[in-house]
């Protein structure tokens, strides 16, 4: 769902246009979620990571961009979705020239890297302001769930119950990970 808004985004930092990722955020992008879904530390569902600066030129990756278990959205994601104002997006950074440097005591990977600070104003300088802005953007969404069975067969009661379970979890996931700034329905039209 996040591909509707992200991640083909760049930032203009000191006159240089920096891609923040292709279809997902670059691995070195600091992208912690604003409203975690399952764990206290989660990287954005759109990619990037949660990075700890070790203050010695190395960075520990506390969470990565894998989707299992499900994760939420960073403030940058929420801004691009029209669910956060620019003032809500904290400064972040992108790590470039990542070189593996070991693992910490918990097994998290450590990298040497070059850190570049990025602000939402840098993103706006490259992409322009989000239109419509947070005050005028869409907040209610509707998605469909399709149940497929072999030709001539009807879906079983169990299959319908599973689809309804997915629907309920999807609606809860969306509300939680957007900080209840947006709602999702699953109503066939």
Segments predicted by a language model, with ranges:
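Active-site recognition of the HExxH zinc-binding catalytic motif
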Residues: 1-15
């Amino acid at each position: 769902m996040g591909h509707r808004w992200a991640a083909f985004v760049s930032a203009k930092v000191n006159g240089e246009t920096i891609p923040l990722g292709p279809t997902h955020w670059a691995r070195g992008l600091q992208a912690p979620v604003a409203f975690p879904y399952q764990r206290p530390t989660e990287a954005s569902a759109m990619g990037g990571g949660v990075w700890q600066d070790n203050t010695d030129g190395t960075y520990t990756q506390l969470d990565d961009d894998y989707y299992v278990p499900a994760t939420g959205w960073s403030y940058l994601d929420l801004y691009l979705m029209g669910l956060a104002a620019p003032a809500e997006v904290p400064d972040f950074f992108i790590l470039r020239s990542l070189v593996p440097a070991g693992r910490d005591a918990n097994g998290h990977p450590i990298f040497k890297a070059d850190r570049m600070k990025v602000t939402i104003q840098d993103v706006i300088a490259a992409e322009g302001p989000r239109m419509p802005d947070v005050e005028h953007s869409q907040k209610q969404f509707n998605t469909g769930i399709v149940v497929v069975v072999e030709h001539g067969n009807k879906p079983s009661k169990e299959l319908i119950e599973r689809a309804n379970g997915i629907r309920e979890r999807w609606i809860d996931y969306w509300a939680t990970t957007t900080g209840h700034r947006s709602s999702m329905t699953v109503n066939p039209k």
